[in-house]
């Protein structure tokens, strides 16, 4: 009887371990083809892989299947809200909103998990090595060499990263579209953090983005009466869930 109980317990533990293990698709170094890792029971089983040893972890992104579905729904809801906002606006404002909407529509988003992926942190941090259950996708690669300008500006897109250059300097050659915030921009760092950066002559502060950051020029409170803060927050959330390029 005791022997049967021990065997049953071992089978139960084994089944539990198999159930808990995650399956991860890994995109590395800009490859369009994923390599699949199975049986990853904890995060360190993934980020501790020798083949990922030279990855740039500040910009790495791991997503979970259900969270990705939610992120895609949020992106679509945001696009709908912007379309409605544009339909109720003047010609100049509508053109600006449409330009912003097109940029957001072009984004590829995923259900990013908010956790530090640096293997050294994963090994030692409290709750830094959670179990992996379900289906995940990991994007890792080398350090980027650009920043991305985004939002209500004349020429959105990538710019070469320059050490020491601040947010206001990156925006100095841009024309702002109708309804743009002229006093502040936002920095979305590669690790998902966001920071509000004063950029006007009266409040300018030296804020340096790191390589791989997005500089977002959003909607101005003084121009938009329909909850610009909520729209800006949702846009920033979508930007934090962008798949690394």
Curated annotation (Swiss-Prot):
Gene3D superfamilies for this protein: 3.10.20.700, Outer membrane lipoprotein wza domain like (3.10.560.10)
Keywords for the protein's UniProt record, in alphabetical order: Signal
InterPro entries associated with the record: Caps_syn_GfcC_N (IPR046459), Caps_synth_GfcC-like_C (IPR010425)
Signal peptide: 1-20
Keyword match Signal: yes
Domain of life: Bacteria
Family per similarity comment: To E.coli YmcB.
Name of the protein in its database record: Uncharacterized protein YjbG
Source organism of the structure: Escherichia coli (strain K12)
Record gene name: yjbG
């Amino acid at each position: 009887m005791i022997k049967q109980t021990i065997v049953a317990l071992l089978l139960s533990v084994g089944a539990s371990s198999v159930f808990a293990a995650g399956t991860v698709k890994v995109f590395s170094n800009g490859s369009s083809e994923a390599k699949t890792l199975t049986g990853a029971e904890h995060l360190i089983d993934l980020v501790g892989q020798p083949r990922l040893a030279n990855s740039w972890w500040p910009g790495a992104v791991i997503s979970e299947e259900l969270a990705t579905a939610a992120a895609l729904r949020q992106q679509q809801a945001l696009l709908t809200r912007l379309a409605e906002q544009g339909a109720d606006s003047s010609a100049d404002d509508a053109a600006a909103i449409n330009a912003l909407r097109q940029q957001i529509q072009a984004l590829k988003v995923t259900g990013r998990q908010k956790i530090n992926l640096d293997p050294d942190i994963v090994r030692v941090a409290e709750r830094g090595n959670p179990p992996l259950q379900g289906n995940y996708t990991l994007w890792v690669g080398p350090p980027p060499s650009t920043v991305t300008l985004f939002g209500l500006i004349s020429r959105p897109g990538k710019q070469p990263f320059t050490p020491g250059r601040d947010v206001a300097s990156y925006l100095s050659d841009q024309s702002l579209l109708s309804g743009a915030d002229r006093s502040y921009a936002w920095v979305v760092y590669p690790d998902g953090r966001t920071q509000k950066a004063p950029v006007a002559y009266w409040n300018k502060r030296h804020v340096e983005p790191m390589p791989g950051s997005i500089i977002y020029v959003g909607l101005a409170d003084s121009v938009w009466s329909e909850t610009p803060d909520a729209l800006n927050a949702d846009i920033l959330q979508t930007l934090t869930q962008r798949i690394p390029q």
